[in-house]
Amino acid sequence: MSEIDLEDLPGVGATTAEKLREAGYGTVESVATATTSDLAEAAEIGEATAKKVILAARKMADIGGFKTGRDILDKRKDIKKLRTLVPEFDELVGGGLETQAITEVYGEFGSGKSQLVHQMAVNAQLPEELGGLGGGVIYVDTENTFRPERIEQMLNGLPEEAEIGEIEEVLERIHVARAHSSDHQMLLLETARELANDLRTSDYPVRLFVIDSLTSLFRSEYAGRGTLAPRQQKLNRHMHDLLKLIDDHNAVGLVTNQVMSNPGILFGDPTKPIGGNIVGHTATFRLYLRKSKGGKRVARLVDSPNLPEGEAAFMVEQAGLKPC
């Protein structure tokens, strides 16, 4: 990450830099990936000035141009994996959930989506050698599903060698915000950026961003086909804001999604996730969870840029996610 201060950018003085930081643009990289209109509004400057600042930031941060495949390979060496600690599940997703990528988990009610994100909120705090990321968590809760009691049960269910502190310490590293509308949900990502920047040099920098659930508020507020276009535009921006966040902090993006039935499918599973192509194209990995016999859950890897489709079974127990 760049060590350049915002004040080093041409046209950005102390006052403008402070306004940018308050709006969530705490790094040169975040300025470089901003839109002209957003930056102009945040810093209260003209769009022409904002454009110059963005171009300068892109040059100083060395982003925005073409890179060779080898450059991309070198960058991918920074990627970490967050494990579920269920061997079959981890094998399915290539060793764990990748940082700098959004993993979407969708399924019907009771399929285990919120159980998975609670488990990841615990596992993220484990040291890397034990499958974690040694970091904290930002958790945007849109359905009032976060339960600290569940975190405690999962903490107690970790392997004996996994020591990350008492429950109070673990909960202190999970920063939860309840979203009440789609606009509030989008605003919370801006607040999350500020918080993550503040924690960047702490013992537990943010390494996991959770949105549970991604689409529920958008779906309830934008009902009917006539509102589909504005809903998708907002959802698209929201997803890309999350992408910028996880890229800037080398973190995992983990979102849950609701489903609907597709009556046009006569054979096979008619269940499909909400959000259409916007969510489908922005999420790097897509996991479909469903209930199975004997209390089992099945995770199916539906989409990945580098992994084959496949399935893994697991159990949701009081102690957390466990192998079958």
From Swiss-Prot:
GO BP annotation list: DNA recombination; DNA repair
Keywords for the protein's UniProt record, in alphabetical order: ATP-binding, DNA damage, DNA recombination, DNA-binding, Nucleotide-binding
Annotated positions binding ATP: G107, E108, F109, G110, S111, G112, K113, S114
MF (Gene Ontology): ATP binding; ATP hydrolysis activity; ATP-dependent DNA damage sensor activity; damaged DNA binding
InterPro entries: AAA+_ATPase (IPR003593), DNA_recomb/repair_Rad51_C (IPR013632), DNA_recomb/repair_RadA (IPR011938), DNA_recomb/repair_RecA-like (IPR016467), DNA_repair_Rad51/TF_NusA_a-hlx (IPR010995), Hlx-hairpin-Hlx_DNA-bd_motif (IPR003583), P-loop_NTPase (IPR027417), RecA_ATP-bd (IPR020588)
SUPFAM superfamilies: P-loop containing nucleoside triphosphate hydrolases, Rad51 N-terminal domain-like
Signal peptide positions on this chain: none
Pfam families in alphabetical order: HHH_5, Rad51
Function comment: Involved in DNA repair and in homologous recombination. Binds and assemble on single-stranded DNA to form a nucleoprotein filament. Hydrolyzes ATP in a ssDNA-dependent manner and promotes DNA strand exchange between homologous DNA molecules.
NCBIfam families in the record: PRK04301.1, recomb_radA
Family: Belongs to the eukaryotic RecA-like protein family.
Protein's name according to its UniProt entry: DNA repair and recombination protein RadA
